[in-house]
Amino acid sequence: MPDPALNVAELLDLDRRHVWHPYGPMPGRQDPLVVESASGVRLRPADGSGELVDGMSSWWSAIHGYNHPVLNAAAREQLERMSHVMFGGLTHEPAVRLAKLLVDMSPEGLEHVFLADSGSVSVEVAVKMCLQYWRSLGRPGKHRLLTWRGGYHGDTWQPMSVCDPEGGMHELWSGVLPRQVFADAPPAEYEETYADHLRSMVERHAGELAAVIVEPVVQGAGGMRFHSPAYLRVLREACDAHDVLLVFDEIATGFGRTGALFAAEHAAVTPDVMCVGKALTGGYLTMAATLCTSRVAEGISRGEVPVLAHGPTFMGNPLAAAVACASIGLLLGQDWLAEVKRIETGLGEGLAPAAGLPGVRDVRVLGAIGVVQLDHAVDMRAATKAAVREGVWLRPFRDLVYTMPPYVTGDADVARIARAVCAAAREG
């Protein structure tokens, strides 16, 4: 007999005692919101307290909203064929179709696709590709990574090593993680002195650098900062001049979030390796990908160990791949850029009043991203409650109250989200 349905209090009690939440203690100290269902851009709490407009796209992934009929149909149809099959020695249409879609839509030259389980894993794979590339070429001394401060690349081992080591989410591990090379954080506008700093850092460390890895145009969970695309061209030129690979982490920025399909397009630059995730499946299932050029793939294949020794159990999962294909088709089949620009305009207008609030350091908007930065650590509980009172779900952190809404969010809901961000900044 199945267990009888649990009421909200029972769910929360079990959750508190047994379930570990992201960046949370055990046992839990705060009760999360129990969500019963979601549709469009709205979450329905199980306590009947009223729907909430989702201002977070479930950590930036649900770009089409929830319960979308096209994505639902893709999942159901694939489920009836096969939900999973191992990817070692086997292949299948959803994975092959997805790889071709990614190659066709990505910056020219990225020809090869490794399908991963999550964004962090895709960064692990990217790092492994770069290190193995130089080992295959007989240059094992090129084993370090250069990045700029203020970044975030994930919570597994190598990604943690290229997150900001001072004040970042993984400062606890600074003594045991691989020691990487850090440039200063990029300024918002182009500054030639900073460009020279980047050139100097690449040149100085070229003999030990396997790759430079950065989040292009937008630094995500490290601080939601924006920077000039021109720095990407500076890095491309410096890496080419000094024989260093270039990796772009597009996990947060990919699939239109910044007003370009991939943020690399703002600079007309192709990296040697690119990571994508989050919005890849429209927020339905966990999947990410690492793309690379033929130079990288062929270099690895010429080595003493001519294979990329990485094989997750759920690699190329057909269910996730089928939904990813449907999500990409949905994105490309509409005027996604007009929708992102519409949201950008709405957030720009709606967040402007926040600039006059006490305690607000900066307000910035790019594409479907809106950020209010405070001059103090946000009171997450107070800020979240303020947003919920406005009928909106937000997840502030550090000194930030921000939103990255689904692209299908209507004008009235964009305005509501902006009001909620302002309220959260005021209360938090």
Swiss-Prot record:
One of its GO terms (molecular function) is adenosylmethionine-8-amino-7-oxononanoate transaminase activity. Substrate binds at residues 59, 152, 278, 311, 395. GO terms for cellular component: cytoplasm. It is an enzyme of class 2 (transferase). Pathway: Cofactor biosynthesis; biotin biosynthesis; 7,8-diaminononanoate from 8-amino-7-oxononanoate (SAM route): step 1/1. GO terms for biological process: biotin biosynthetic process. Its EC number is 2.6.1.62. Its cofactor is pyridoxal 5'-phosphate. Keywords: Aminotransferase, Biotin biosynthesis, Cytoplasm, Pyridoxal phosphate, S-adenosyl-L-methionine, Transferase. It catalyses: (8S)-8-amino-7-oxononanoate + S-adenosyl-L-methionine = S-adenosyl-4-methylsulfanyl-2-oxobutanoate + (7R,8S)-7,8-diammoniononanoate. The record marks 23 as: Participates in the substrate recognition with KAPA and in a stacking interaction with the adenine ring of SAM. The modification N6-(pyridoxal phosphate)lysine is found at residue 278. InterPro entries: Aminotrans_3 (IPR005814), Aminotrans_3_PPA_site (IPR049704), BioA (IPR005815), PyrdxlP-dep_Trfase (IPR015424), PyrdxlP-dep_Trfase_major (IPR015421), PyrdxlP-dep_Trfase_small (IPR015422). Pyridoxal 5'-phosphate binds at residues 119-120, 249, 312-313. It is found in: Cytoplasm. Belongs to the class-III pyridoxal-phosphate-dependent aminotransferase family. BioA subfamily. Homodimer. Catalyzes the transfer of the alpha-amino group from S-adenosyl-L-methionine (SAM) to 7-keto-8-aminopelargonic acid (KAPA) to form 7,8-diaminopelargonic acid (DAPA). It is the only aminotransferase known to utilize SAM as an amino donor. This is Adenosylmethionine-8-amino-7-oxononanoate aminotransferase.
